[in-house]
């Protein structure tokens, strides 16, 4: 994990970056997050676990314990109503089965809030409540989820599941982070912690060896980035240093040079029907990879390819359009244009890594408690205390 920020109430960093004169960045993340974290955690103290076993879709080829979702942009063919679905890029089919995805997002929101509240207060009631949900998802035989995504983003008449569906479990990342936050508390027994980590280890093995996982790794756009982000997070939780090393090299040698242009943009995302949202999503995911994998001796935020592609360039490209979206020179997103931006994690992680006040200041001005379901789905980093305090 990124070790440069230690547990404390006030983060004060003195630096000299890229030849600039030494400056001081004073950033009280605990104070910024305190009210919203404790408010949200208070609500989640009353919530009972809901896992994949709480509902089943008859179109699923899996069992009650298998996560199931359907491809977003696939619709009935008007010319062949009973035939295979057809694709409409960027247009979400509202009749798709999304109950398992909603349950996982809810689990992520609960975990993030409770884990963050425990960091702030060390009150075991937050850890105890989180453990109830962890046991339901990963331990209890009647309610746990199988550690694979064989039936994610299925398409009627075409596929019972696809590698592209792996992106659905980006919402387990802050679950993993929350586990790390409470793992030394009295709420989680050694036996339960071992079982939970074994679940993540099994899922990590599936992600890195199954044909769906390999396909997602090699997809080439934001899906490859999110595959690496998940793999890095789960390897960090399970202390799989071999996989973490692989992810560092994958970021340096594949993701950054293959997806970022020399101006810091992401051409593969700009070609999509939602170029603004996808660009934000991708820079956030890359910054999150850097936040997990950076070490004192290998800081991915400072890494640059030989031709100058790096995270600073990527954030410099998108930041002006976060500040003023009306300047966006590309096509407007076909859906959810008005809902973006929100509190993009790349601004925080990059701002702290480079000690750049304009980014942390901008981050603070943006909405942290967004409610649009599509925005929530595409913002897996919601509770930054889990990420920057060890």
PLM regions and their residue ranges:
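Bacterial N-terminal signal peptides that target proteins for export
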Residues: 1-9
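Bacterial N-terminal signal peptides
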Residues: 8-16
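Hydrophobic alpha-helical membrane context
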Residues: 15-18, 242
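Extracellular glycan-targeting catalytic surfaces
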Residues: 20-214, 225, 294-297, 304-390
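Short, contiguous, pocket-lining structural segments
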Residues: 163, 167, 171, 192-199, ...
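Long, repeat-rich segments with strong aromatic
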Residues: 233-329
């Amino acid at each position: 994990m990124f070790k440069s920020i230690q547990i404390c109430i006030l983060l004060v960093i003195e630096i000299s970056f890229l030849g600039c004169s030494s400056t001081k960045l004073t950033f009280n993340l605990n104070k910024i997050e305190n009210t919203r974290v404790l408010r949200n955690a208070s609500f989640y103290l009353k919530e009972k676990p809901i896992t994949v076993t709480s509902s089943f879709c008859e179109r699923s080829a899996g069992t009650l314990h298998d996560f199931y979702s359907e491809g977003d942009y696939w619709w009935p063919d008007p010319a062949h109503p009973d035939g295979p679905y057809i694709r409409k890029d960027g247009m979400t089919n509202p009749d798709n089965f999304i109950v398992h995805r909603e349950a996982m997002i809810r689990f992520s929101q609960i975990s993030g809030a409770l884990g963050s509240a425990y960091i702030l207060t060390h009150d075991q009631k937050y850890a105890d409540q989180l453990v109830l949900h962890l046991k339901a998802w990963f331990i209890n035989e009647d309610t746990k989820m199988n550690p694979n995504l064989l039936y994610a983003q299925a398409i009627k008449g075409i596929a019972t599941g696809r590698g592209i569906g792996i992106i659905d479990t980006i919402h387990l990342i802050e679950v993993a982070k929350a586990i790390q936050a409470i793992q030394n508390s009295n709420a989680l027994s050694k036996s339960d912690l071992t079982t939970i980590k074994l679940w993540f280890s099994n899922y990590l093995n599936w992600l890195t060896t199954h044909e769906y996982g390999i396909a997602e790794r090699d997809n080439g756009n934001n899906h490859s980035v999110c595959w690496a982000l998940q793999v890095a997070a789960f390897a960090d939780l399970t202390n799989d240093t071999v996989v973490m090393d692989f992810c560092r090299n994958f970021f340096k040698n594949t993701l950054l040079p293959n997806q970022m242009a020399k101006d810091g943009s992401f051409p593969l995302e700009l070609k999509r029907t939602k170029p603004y949202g996808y660009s934000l999503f991708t820079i956030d995911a890359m910054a999150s990879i850097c936040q997990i994998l950076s070490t004192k001796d290998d800081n991915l935020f400072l890494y640059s390819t030989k031709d100058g592609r790096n995270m600073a360039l990527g954030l410099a490209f998108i930041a002006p359009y976060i500040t003023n979206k009306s300047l966006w020179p590309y096509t407007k997103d076909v859906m959810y244009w008005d809902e973006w931006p929100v509190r993009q994690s790349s601004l925080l992680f990059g701002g702290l890594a480079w000690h750049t006040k304009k980014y942390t200041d901008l981050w603070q001005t943006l909405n942290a408690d967004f409610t649009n379901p599509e925005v929530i789905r595409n913002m897996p980093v919601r509770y930054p205390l889990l990420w920057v305090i060890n």
